[in-house]
Curated annotation (Swiss-Prot):
Residues engaged in binding ATP: 10-17
MF terms (GO), sorted A to Z: ATP binding; tRNA dimethylallyltransferase activity
Family matches, as Gene3D superfamilies: 1.10.20.140, P-loop containing nucleotide triphosphate hydrolases
Any single Pfam family the record assigns to this protein: IPPT
Family: Belongs to the IPP transferase family.
Protein name: tRNA dimethylallyltransferase
Lineage: Bacteria, Bacillati, Bacillota, Clostridia, Thermoanaerobacterales
Residues involved in substrate binding: 12-17
Keywords, alphabetical: ATP-binding, Magnesium, Nucleotide-binding, Transferase, tRNA processing
Cofactor: Mg(2+)
Positions of the UniProt region annotated as Interaction with substrate tRNA: 35-38
InterPro entries found in the cross-reference section: Dimethylallyltransferase (IPR039657), IPT (IPR018022), P-loop_NTPase (IPR027417)
Organism field: Caldanaerobacter subterraneus subsp. tengcongensis (strain DSM 15242 / JCM 11007 / NBRC 100824 / MB4)
Site (Interaction with substrate tRNA): 101, 124
Length: 315
């Protein structure tokens, strides 16, 4: 019989982590993160990682599992997350997958064959060296040649995603956009997914929330966090340090831009990322959307979601 899983998805800054904890408490569950940046140790502020206090004693998996200089593929995520889901289920608890990384979610709900593609660290290193020598734009032009569809969706300065798209094409012969299309993909029969999407009807409210969150990160010493990571010896060209919120602070520390400019770049980049996430999650035909601004309080939103889940879950 298929394992019932709850997935809580949506753009950044919509309150997914908080809701996941409440759902876990109400329905006897454990949380599995589906966030490609929260897997990294020591990167807490810039990734808006849930704190021990916020977890309220609920076990959280797939957080703080790799060093910032380590590579971590979707195939690796799929393998580990599926083993954890199985274990949670076998212990009689509800697996709750929460996060905004679309490919991580896809690796669970669809048959993706990610595990057939491990990629190549050598290839990624070679691409990073080319970017250091000729600039990110050189690789972006290459991507436009082999996968114009992916190039349209990826920002010209997003080195991490550019390299990933080139790598997929290099080793599978197919563009990454091929793997990102949900139409025609087969659902994974191992799972019976109940997917909840959190969003705002008023996009401006979401953008304001994002801006406030970035200001909070700066207040909570994001700059210091990046300084410490660089001191430990993590390379500014490493996968993790190319992440949104980190690469801009590195630019500031290198004297390339002011702190104000770095903050604005993070806000703009995060708003753009949220837009991409919304587009991605709208493609799921089995998602049930809940709009935060439809409710007067968080408690009202939470109770509505509890009611919906109670009608769907098989106890």
């Amino acid at each position: 019989m298929a394992i019932q899983i709850v997935l809580i998805v949506g753009p950044t800054a919509t309150g997914k982590s908080r809701l996941a904890v409440d759902v876990a408490k109400r329905f006897n569950g454990e949380v599995v993160s589906a966030d490609s940046m929260q897997i990294y140790k020591y990167m807490d502020i810039g990734t808006a990682k849930i704190t021990k206090e916020e977890m309220q004693g609920i076990p959280h998996h797939m957080i703080d599992i790799v060093e910032p200089n380590e590579e971590f593929s979707v195939a690796e995520y799929e393998k580990r997350a599926k083993a954890i889901i199985k274990d949670i289920h076998e212990r009689g608890k509800l697996p709750i997958i929460v996060g905004g990384t679309g490919l991580y979610i896809n690796s669970i709900v669809y048959i993706m064959h990610f595990s057939d593609f491990e990629g190549s660290k050598e290839f990624r290193e070679k691409m990073k060296k080319l970017a250091e020598t000729y600039g990110t734009s050189y690789l972006y032009e290459k991507l436009k040649e082999v996968d114009p569809e992916a190039a349209r969706k990826i920002h010209p300065n997003d080195l991490r995603r550019i390299i990933r798209a080139l790598e997929v094409y290099e080793f599978t012969g197919k563009p990454i956009s091929h793997y990102q299309k949900m139409s025609g993909m087969r659902k994974n029969p191992e799972y019976d997914p109940i997917m909840i999407g959190l969003n705002y009807k008023n996009r401006q409210l979401l953008y304001e929330k994002i801006n406030r969150r970035v200001d909070e990160m700066i207040k909570n010493n994001l700059v210091e966090e990046v300084v410490n990571l660089l001191k430990i010896g993590y390379n500014k060209y490493g996968t993790s340090m190319q992440a949104l919120g980190y690469k801009e602070i590195v630019e500031y520390l290198n004297g390339e831009i002011s702190l104000e400019e770095a903050v604005e770049k993070i806000k703009k980049g995060t708003r753009r990322y949220a837009k991409r996430q919304i587009t991605w999650f709208k493609a799921y035909d089995f998602i049930k959307w809940f709009f935060v601004d439809d409710y007067k309080t968080y408690e009202e939103l939470r109770e509505n979601i509890f009611e919906y889940l109670a009608g769907k879950l098989k106890f």
